[in-house]
């Protein structure tokens, strides 16, 4: 399937046919993949994406790297060090081959997805934090004198 223009990424990631997500490791995409419980193949380009990649692959163990090494100041531009097709193939096979490491990565990704789901439910940590923020903003608004 080819989608032109904006794609409903959250809906796509939630589809049961999705086995992995090739991501540039932007924070929004990372959070969406984690929330969906989908393991990631990481390909950072610039800014904080290389740090996010380390969080995904080394700290949390919910993805594999393609081996991008060259950081770019302006994002998508010509590179001196290209990621070759053999590196991409290796990352895809590592995650999709059904071996023990792939199963463990998938298990951890699904575990994080369940945790993320609980966090946004009523009473969950994200729900509580957002509710506290709203309450603080209301108190701040109500404490200001009317002009």
Where are these regions (language model features)?
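Catalytic core of nucleotide-sugar-dependent glycosyltransferases
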Residues: 1-147
């Amino acid at each position: 399937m080819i989608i032109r223009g904006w794609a409903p990424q959250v809906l796509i990631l939630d589809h049961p046919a999705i086995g992995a997500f090739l991501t540039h490791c932007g924070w929004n995409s990372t959070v969406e993949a984690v929330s969906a419980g989908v393991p990631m193949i990481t390909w950072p380009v610039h800014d904080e994406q290389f740090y996010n990649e380390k969080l995904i692959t080394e700290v949390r163990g919910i993805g594999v790297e393609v081996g991008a090494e060259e950081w770019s100041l302006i994002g998508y531009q010509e590179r001196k060090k290209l990621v070759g097709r053999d590196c991409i193939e290796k990352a895809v096979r590592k995650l999709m081959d059904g071996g023990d490491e792939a199963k463990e990565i998938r298990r951890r990704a699904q575990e994080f997805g369940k945790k993320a789901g609980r966090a946004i439910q009523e009473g969950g940590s994200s729900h509580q934090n957002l509710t506290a923020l709203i309450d603080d903003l209301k108190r701040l608004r109500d404490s200001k004198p009317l002009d």
